[in-house]
Curated annotation (Swiss-Prot):
The lineage of its organism: Eukaryota, Metazoa, Chordata, Craniata, Vertebrata. Interacts with PRKCABP, and disrupts the interaction between GRIA2 and PRKCABP, leading to the internalization of GRIA2. Found in a complex with VAMP8. Component of a SNARE-like complex that contains at least ZW10, USE1L, RINT1, STX18 and NAPA/SNAP-alpha. Interacts with VTI1A. Interacts with STX12. Interacts with GNA12 (via N-terminus); the interaction promotes CDH5 localization to plasma membrane. This is Alpha-soluble NSF attachment protein. InterPro entries: NSF_attach, TPR-like_helical_dom_sf. GO terms for molecular function: protein-containing complex binding; SNARE binding; soluble NSF attachment protein activity; syntaxin binding. The keyword Acetylation applies. It comes from Rattus norvegicus (Rat). Signal peptide: none annotated. The gene is Napa.
Length: 295
């Protein structure tokens, strides 16, 4: 694709849009429908933005979408303005993550003002993902996942809310905010128990909650396992519960080999992900004479 040609076309469209805006501000335009010129300018800015996208000039595309959004606001077209801010955010994602967040936040402001909380929640997730992958700021990612969960809950979209909360719990545990993680895992685990479709995953949430308890204190973990078995009898027969009991026993005996062996055995059937590996290593370090490795 001829990107330089697309770039030149986009620049020409920008100039045309700017002329329309200027003309709309003249005295005669004010008398004879300046707003239709603004509408035309909105359209031309959006065309320019798409042309910049084809030329892979993401910042220029983002800026052109922002110009269109501002004009839509001038015309009181809130929905169109929000759509343009989202388009701007998506373009900036490829060039300037912080600017992408700023644009998505502008869109969220408009959507919440209009009472469109489900769509606002979706864009909070997009912001959280930028903080996770591009800007690597876990605290801010957590805040946006929490906000998203709040909006979803308010709209009775509980399964979407729980997905966001599980992200929060995972990061909270990594940041050693164990009680926060435990509260979420227990809450999501309890609600999963009552659903025929989600029942099977309840054991995983109780397992994760028990590991967080273990990171705080062994007695805590022991009591938690008992509580989960009473609450959800199917947990007793799960491989996760059996592993917890073996780990508690190994910890009580301060037996590193037994601890490592139990983890290896579990891992041979259900591969440990990064999160579980981190938690299990933290617990292992509290056993005397540990050798730093799980396998």
């Amino acid at each position: 694709m001829d990107t330089s040609g697309k770039q030149a076309e986009a620049m020409a469209l920008l100039a045309e849009a700017e002329r329309k805006v200027k003309n709309s501000q003249s005295f005669f335009s004010g008398l004879f429908g300046g707003s239709s010129k603004i509408e035309e300018a909105c359209e031309i800015y959006a065309r320019a933005a798409n042309m910049f996208k084809m030329a892979k000039n993401w910042s220029a595309a983002g800026n052109a979408f922002c110009q269109a959004a501002q004009l839509h606001l001038q015309l009181q077209s809130k929905h169109d303005a929000a759509t343009c801010f989202v388009d701007a955010g998506n373009a900036f994602k490829k060039a300037d993550p912080q600017e992408a967040i700023n644009c998505l936040m502008r869109a969220i402001e408009i959507y919440t003002d209009m009472g469109r909380f489900t769509i606002a929640a979706k864009h909070h997730i997009s912001i959280a993902e930028i903080y996770e992958t591009e800007l690597v700021d876990v605290e801010k990612a957590i805040a946006h996942y929490e906000q998203s969960a709040d909006y979803y809950k308010g709209e009775e979209s509980n399964s979407s809310a729980n997905k966001c909360l599980l992200k929060v719990a995972g990061y909270a545990a990594q940041l050693e905010q164990y009680q926060k993680a435990i509260d979420i895992y227990e809450q999501v685990g309890t609600s999963a128990m009552d659903s025929p479709l989600l029942k099977y995953s309840a054991k995983d949430y109780f397992f994760k909650a028990a590991l967080c308890h273990f990171c705080i204190d062994m007695l805590n973990a022991k009591l938690a396992v008992q509580k989960y078995e009473e609450l959800f009898p199917a947990f007793s027969d799960s491989r996760e519960c059996k592993l917890m009991k073996k780990l508690l026993e190994a910890h009580e005996e301060q037996n590193v080999d037994s601890y490592t062996e139990s983890v290896k055995e579990y891992d041979s059937i259900s591969r440990l992900d990064q999160w579980l590996t981190t938690m299990l290593l933290r617990i292992k370090k509290t056993i005397q004479g540990d050798e730093e490795d799980l396998r």
